[in-house]
């Protein structure tokens, strides 16, 4: 049996994520597919912010305790550092497993007791070289084949969505955010903006 998985921060979930998952689940019917949400969040520097912190402010918003963080697997407390309810909702229509790990090494260790012919990692074409280098650095490149997943919508990314929040571009924000999440994101948009404004004052 072949195993396929994808890993990402999903910060936040976009219609691009859902499109890619939809396409690949239908393409790889009758096999095991795993969606892995990366649960590693770096700690922010409270004394002096950097442009990188502003660009990835969701991570620092989480690590500063603005949003409650609990690290656990989906079958345990079912919590994600961003929002476990969003995770469950987004993948509720798919016959796949959702789990939380720190990195790709932990991902493959989860499957060590599962018999499979080959382990495949699906990613966007913009992440292909990056993931290959990471796997080589972790000495697990021989255990995983990295493939470009199909179904990704051009021009839609978490980066674009985060930039829309920073620019207070609510129209773009609503056009990219995964539809099931919209009802929760009015407060989130305000919270995110307040934090990025706070970071800018520290630069």
Show the residue positions of the predicted features:
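Nucleotidyltransferase catalytic core that binds NTPs
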Residues: 1-203
């Amino acid at each position: 049996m072949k195993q396929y998985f994808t890993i990402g921060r999903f910060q936040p979930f976009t219609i691009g994520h859902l499109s890619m998952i939809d396409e690949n689940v239908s393409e790889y019917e009758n096999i095991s597919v795993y969606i892995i949400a990366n649960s590693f969040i770096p700690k922010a520097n409270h004394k002096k912010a950097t442009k990188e912190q502003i660009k990835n402010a969701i991570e620092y918003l989480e690590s500063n305790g603005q949003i409650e963080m609990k690290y656990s697997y989906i079958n345990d407390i079912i919590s994600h550092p961003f929002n476990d309810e969003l995770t469950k909702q987004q993948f509720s229509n798919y016959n796949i497993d959702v789990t939380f790990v720190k990195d790709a090494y932990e991902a493959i260790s989860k499957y060590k007791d599962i018999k499979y012919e080959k382990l495949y990692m699906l990613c966007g074409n913009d992440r292909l070289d990056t993931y290959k280098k990471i796997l080589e650095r972790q000495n697990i490149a021989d255990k995983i084949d990295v493939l470009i997943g199909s179904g990704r919508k051009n021009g839609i990314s978490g980066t674009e969505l985060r930039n829309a929040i920073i620019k207070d571009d609510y129209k773009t924000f609503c056009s990219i955010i995964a539809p099931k999440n919209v009802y929760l994101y009015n407060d989130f948009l305000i919270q995110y903006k307040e934090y990025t404004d706070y970071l800018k004052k520290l630069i």
